Amino acid sequence: MSKEKEVLLNEEIRADEIRCVGDDGKVYGIISSDEALEIANRLGLDLVMIAADAKPPVCKIMDYGKFRYQQEKKQKEAKKKQKVIDIKEIKLSVKIAQNDINYKVKHALEFLEQGKHVRFRVFLKGREMATPEAGVALLEKIWTMIENEANRDKEPNFEGRYVNMLVTPKKA
């Protein structure tokens, strides 16, 4: 289930010779895996393979349960620090009135002030599909109204029945 690679522990380590390091940083040098396992058992710890690719493989004597707990804790911290980008979508049509454009732009500016990304989508109906330039022209008109408050990620582009434009808030 977990995506992390399987770690070899104790008896699972099949190498004849390994480079062994203690939990406290003590270097045991290149010793047999049986000898390293004996040292780990004497200390009440686990023998964990850290670098299987190295010649000879590198193993560390440590408390594996504690090590795994710390790894999971680091992953949770990293996940908390990730920023989720919220994209708000504003749908338009080619035959939209100027007052409606002003209303939608006002909402877009509110979203941008909140730090959200805004995607403008112009839906092309029927014969409007033959001239997507009208949708691009509408998005350019909207861009002139918001360019002081936003950065344009992409030029207006045509996808299926839509002409899209993504804008992001300007950095303060």
Swiss-Prot record:
GO terms for molecular function: ribosome binding; translation initiation factor activity. Pfam families: IF3_C (PF00707), IF3_N (PF05198). Keywords: Cytoplasm, Initiation factor, Protein biosynthesis. Its main location: cytoplasm. One of its GO terms (biological process) is ribosome disassembly. Gene3D superfamilies: Translation initiation factor 3 (IF-3), C-terminal domain, Translation initiation factor 3 (IF-3), N-terminal domain. The keyword Ubl conjugation does not apply. GO terms for cellular component: cytosol; membrane. InterPro entries: T_IF-3_C_sf (IPR036788), T_IF-3_N_sf (IPR036787), Translation_initiation_fac3_CS (IPR019813), Translation_initiation_fac_3 (IPR001288), Translation_initiation_fac_3_C (IPR019815), Translation_initiation_fac_3_N (IPR019814). It comes from the Bacteria. PROSITE patterns: IF3. It is found in: Cytoplasm. Belongs to the IF-3 family. IF-3 binds to the 30S ribosomal subunit and shifts the equilibrium between 70S ribosomes and their 50S and 30S subunits in favor of the free subunits, thus enhancing the availability of 30S subunits on which protein synthesis initiation begins. Monomer. This is Translation initiation factor IF-3. It comes from Campylobacter jejuni (strain RM1221).
